[in-house]
Amino acid sequence: MLHISSMPSDYGVGVFDENVIHFIDKIADMGFTYWQVLPFNPIDRANSPYCSPSAFAGNYIFINPKGLYDMGLICEEDYKSNIYDGTPYTADYEFAGKKRLELLKKAFLNINDELARQIKEFEISNSWLTDYSVFMAVKEEENMKPWWEWSDEHAHYFECIKDIYSYEKSAAFWKFVQFVFYKQWNEIKAYANKKGVAVIGDMPIYVAMDSVDVWSNLPMFLIDEKTLKVEKVAGVPPDYFSKDGQLWGNPIYDWNAMEKDDFSWWISRIGHSLKLYDTVRIDHFRAFASYWAVPAESKTAKVGEWLDGPKMKLFNKVFEAYPNAPIIAEDLGVFGDDVVKLLEDTGFPGMKVVQFGFDPNSDSSHIPHNSVQNSINYVGTHDNNTILGWLWEASDEERKFALEYCGFTGDNWGEGGYYSPSCRKIIETVWKSSSNVAIIALQDMCGFGSDARMNIPGVPEKNWRFRTTKETIDNIDSSYFKHINSLFRRMYPAFDDKKN
């Protein structure tokens, strides 16, 4: 597991360039057949890919500047202006966002008739693009304010879209941006697939209030269409990650309204994700069974209520459109019988995280000996500490149990690095599980500590910043991972012969 933002690059964050190709080559040589990424959507001000202005658009900061040069749209001096001279170990979203936007606007001025034709074809096959491009064009005109603070003629979607031709030129730029994003990503994905590596993507369940999805589809959300008042917002109650719960603040879907048109927005969204990736992990899957609704004025997620989700009414429609859809259900956190039943009814694999299993006082479903075959087993997710960081921060009782369970008998459990003996024992324990798929973050392949953690749920600052270098990737003990992938029979192909 390694997100694009965390890849090595010369541009402040990872981009779709030769460094990603190199990473794919390395993991393929080690026998890995799955590569998991975080959501590709544009990010919010806290740099979170889970709170986006669009459920369909891609984040333009991942566009490779040199790729624009290779398309003949900019000169060498232009793309080199995007080169970053700061630390290679931290993603600089502010730098990348500013520089990439400037470069894309310059490139847009140089598109020719053939490229314009290709962009038009892209637009025709992506129905979401018109609303998104108008939304972004108007947002720029409104000085990037949230849409509910726009002037009346813009804030109301149906009034704004009547005058769509007045935004044609400025909207055309955003169509171009998405065309380039998907062109570059599709080339990367095709290469990964050719190397036998399938991409597991991530789809957030909720969208941001300040998003094209809410602006253009108000009746789909529990929002007063006249006052724009939101009574309840999304979150989760207190859990492993946070004693106050997590107050996400996203608007909540009006499932009854969505059912009336056979969940068409969700069918489109899931279909889009299935084209973007080979397999889709749906974040916070439990909300389809029941979801935590928090009063909009609340400062924490402690106070709320469980409300019914659409359950199989939605997924019956999904299966009608996409039989055998390759979906992973992120089923972590607090859940009850309704979530268990929904998992059984859909047949989707759930998730196991070994760190959650190291409770000496219970026989957790996350402990590897309780793993079921139809599951994905993680050393840790993007929301977890690194495994070395966890060992250092765990209670003495938890750490003793974890090390004993994994068969580690030495006294150097705190030793990190590429050959960390304690990390290897835990990795091997996950690899021995009966779960069909086992996944590890790059940080844990390297034996990094908690300073390399990707995200701390409930903490708004300094997340999503981890970056690696080419040297780090090259220093990973490839022979070790190739050995355990072979030893524990995890080198099976991600694609069958028919797909190849």
Region spans (language model):
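Conserved, well-ordered alpha-helix/loop/beta-strand core segments that scaffold catalytic motifs
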Residues: W174-V207
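Short glycine/serine/threonine/alanine-rich loop segments
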Residues: F32, V197, A325
